[in-house]
Swiss-Prot record:
Pathway: Mycotoxin biosynthesis. Belongs to the cytochrome P450 family. This is Cytochrome P450 monooxygenase FGSG_15680. Cytochrome P450 monooxygenase; part of the gene cluster that mediates the biosynthesis of gramillins A and B, bicyclic lipopeptides that induce cell death in maize leaves but not in wheat leaves. The nonribosomal peptide synthetase GRA1 incorporates respectively a glutamic adic (Glu), a leucine (Leu), a serine (Ser), a hydroxyglutamine (HOGln), a 2-amino decanoic acid, and 2 cysteins (CysB and CysA). The biosynthesis of 2-amino decanoic acid incorporated in gramillins could be initiated by a fatty acid synthase composed of the alpha and beta subunits FGSG_00036 and FGSG_11656. GO terms for molecular function: heme binding; iron ion binding; monooxygenase activity; oxidoreductase activity, acting on paired donors, with incorporation or reduction of molecular oxygen. Heme binds at residue 351. Pfam families: p450. Keywords: Heme, Iron, Metal-binding, Monooxygenase, Oxidoreductase. PROSITE patterns: CYTOCHROME_P450. InterPro entries: Cyt_P450, Cyt_P450_CS, Cyt_P450_E_grp-I, Cyt_P450_sf, Cytochrome_P450_monoxygenase. The lineage of its organism: Eukaryota, Fungi, Dikarya, Ascomycota, Pezizomycotina. Its cofactor is heme. Its EC number is 1.-.-.-.
Length: 430
């Protein structure tokens, strides 16, 4: 496997300059090519995304998850107690944006309850179309062909940049220590090795990256998890039994030992990210002077190399029956499977927010499964998000949650209905 030869810290590579397509004004931890500059950014950011920081944000995350639950249960059929149908790709995007805006900026935008700012999610998705192409085919930037090819995507980008710039500017007018948020940390933290801090442009760049990455990737993982759980009833019943035996009611779900012991639920999330990775394409690295050997092959300097995450996640050498949803593979301490698992990338460039993201995913999935019974919407709506036998190449897997790679993933569905458990218990008693 070429993955260790490309992504480990000793590889003679650096991040491809293609990622500059994602850059605005200043480099960020995702786009910085220089290893020293990246290391400095990572050390500063890691202070604000440590395990202790994640635990401190637990109540904030849970607050928004409960708001999503309140939204869902507010529109139910009085006879059946089942809710109206919800496209969870949209609602999870609103949820994760609300969480990230609160955690990063201390700002409650409440996309879950108010449509005023929901255009921001559309702007992120629309902007990523152009960016995704430029990362894979930077030739499209020659003579600014991207302006002709992606005018709508550029408009979306400008809309998002304007929004995030005003958000940062508004936040910078308040004193850093007045709020317990990540941007307060970014404004004051210093690199432990150099003593260097972030400029205001760098704070804006890192904050924007956290918002986009935290919104898109987590919402995709949540939508994929509920897709697969409702596609595989036996797995759904096992996950439900696990979390409901650990928590009597949804309000009891919180970060800590009881949630950590829900190992099958975590396995369901990990298997969902294996089958439908939120960022599925190759993470490009450029070979430096002296070359690099990859899986026994000598690669010359200047070449861009990478491993496609979707491809390695579906390689039967690491995952027998690779297109089957099998959470049990993550309960077997299979080092082969773990070595190929890359939803958060690997090595020194791996996602700095992995711990935060997994805490968020576990809180959301466990809370929803404790509070609600879940089913697919009836009719054609219930098929949204899955493949079709008559679909184009690569889209015929009925049991696979379909994603479109635009740096992160564009998705639709699953469309679900929810029923509060306490209403079922009450009607049975009557």
């Amino acid at each position: 496997m070429g993955k260790p030869d490309i992504y480990n810290s000793s590889a003679n590579v650096e991040k491809s300059p293609y990622y500059k397509a994602m850059q605005h004004r200043a480099p960020n931890v995702l786009t910085a090519v220089d290893k020293k500059a990246h290391g400095m950014r990572r050390r500063i950011l890691s202070q604000g995304l440590s395990d202790s920081s994640t635990r401190a944000f637990g109540n904030t995350i849970k607050k928004h998850i409960e708001r999503l639950c309140q939204k869902i249960e507010g529109h139910s059929d009085p006879n059946t107690q089942w809710s109206e149908s919800y496209d969870m790709a949209r609602w999870f995007s609103y949820l994760t944006f609300d969480i990230m805006a609160d955690v990063v900026f201390g700002q409650p935008y409440n996309l879950l309850g108010n449509s005023e700012y929901r255009y921001v999610v559309d702007s992120i998705e629309g902007s990523n179309i152009r960016t995704g192409v430029l990362i894979q085919a930077p030739e499209a930037y020659t003579w600014r062909l991207d302006k002709r090819l992606f005018p709508a995507s550029i408009r979306h980008r400008n809309t998002f940049v304007k929004f995030i710039s005003s958000l940062v500017q508004e936040r910078l007018t308040t004193k850093p220590l007045e709020r317990d948020d990540i941007i307060s940390h970014l404004l004051t933290a210093k690199d432990s090795e150099t003593g260097q801090g972030f400029t205001k442009n760098e704070v804006a760049a890192e904050s924007s990256t956290l918002i986009v990455a935290g919104t898109d990737t987590s919402s995709t993982a949540l939508a994929a998890t509920l897709f697969y759980l409702t596609q595989y009833p036996n797995m759904y019943r096992r996950a439900v039994a696990e979390v409901r035996s650990s928590f009597a009611k949804s309000q009891d779900v919180k970060l800590g030992r009881a949630l950590n012991e829900c190992v099958f639920t975590r396995a369901c999330i990990e298997e969902s990210m294996r089958l439908s990775p939120p960022a599925a394409s190759a993470l490009w690295r450029r070979v430096q002077v002296g070359g690099q050997t990859v899986d026994g092959h000598a690669i010359q300097a200047g070449c861009n190399i990478g491993v496609c995450i979707y491809a390695i996640h579906h390689n039967e050498l690491y995952y027998p029956d690779p297109f089957v949803f099998n959470p049990d593979r993550w309960l077997q301490n299979d080092k082969q499977a773990q070595s190929a698992f890359s939803p958060f990338s690997v090595g020194p460039r791996s996602c700095i927010g992995k711990g935060f993201a997994m805490a968020e995913l576990m809180l959301a999935v466990a809370t929803i499964l404790v509070k609600f019974d879940i089913r697919r919407a009836p009719g054609d709506q219930g098929c949204i998000g899955q493949g079709h036998l008559e679909g184009e190449d690569g889209r015929r897997m009925v049991d696979e949650y379909q994603l479109h790679d635009h740096v992160t993933a564009f998705k639709q569905g699953p469309v679900l209905q929810f029923r509060r458990r306490d209403t079922v218990v009450q009607s049975e008693a009557e």
